[in-house]
Design a protein with these regions (language model features):
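Amphipathic, alpha-helical segments enriched in basic
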Residues: 3-6, 10-13, 62-63, 91, ...
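Flexible beta-alpha connector loops of hexameric P-loop NTPases
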Residues: 1, 17-25, 56-70, 97-108
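Cytosolic-facing regulatory segments adjacent to core modules
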Residues: 1-43, 57, 157-160
Length: 173
């Protein structure tokens, strides 16, 4: 039964218009060009960047890495507006989160740029207490921390974490 589900799922993905572009160190201008092309040819509906710090900026040698990340962040926001599609960008956190007793990430932990926080409409973090505390009573529970939401409330949502499937699920009550 599991094999049949796997084959069925692979078929669904294969028949979809999912495009995976794993160009290493893609520049923001190259991404913009590809997204415009995909929008015309495939009616692009979503862009996911995994992850922001692997991209390169405009290539100006005078820019610091922080300035380069700021330019990338701003350009992704402009791309979302231009193509009218959501852009989801994963970002690395600074090491500061590891230094605190409470390891829940905060907006100030976004690595290399305050511009990410400023440009984003929504910022969400994942926190699992069992990652840091092996004896926790919260085993298998993930906190989805909505730290910023331009047009809505912030807060935390608890979900079940199913590592054997790399999946989040609603908690059973």
């Amino acid at each position: 039964a599991d094999w049949e589900k796997l084959v069925e799922g692979a078929g669904i993905i294969g028949d979809s218009e999912l495009i995976i572009d794993d160009t290493p160190g893609i520049s923001i201008s190259e991404l913009r060009s590809k997204c415009r092309k995909y929008k015309l040819e495939h009616d692009l509906k979503l862009v996911i960047i995994d992850y922001l710090q692997l991209m390169t900026g405009s290539g100006r040698s005078t820019d610091s890495r922080q300035q380069e990340i700021s330019d990338i962040s701003r350009s992704l926001k402009a791309l979302a507006r231009e193509l009218n599609v959501p852009v989801v960008a994963l970002s690395q956190l600074s090491r500061a989160v590891e230094q605190r007793p409470d390891h829940r990430p905060m907006l100030s932990d976004l690595r290399e740029s305050g511009a990410i926080e400023q440009d984003a409409d929504v910022v969400m973090f994942i926190y699992r207490d069992d990652y840091y505390n092996k004896d926790t009573e919260l085993k298998g529970i993930s906190e989805i921390i909505i730290a910023k939401q331009r047009n809505g409330p912030i807060g935390t949502v608890n979900l079940a974490w199913l590592p054997e499937y790399t999946k989040f699920a609603n908690l059973e009550h």
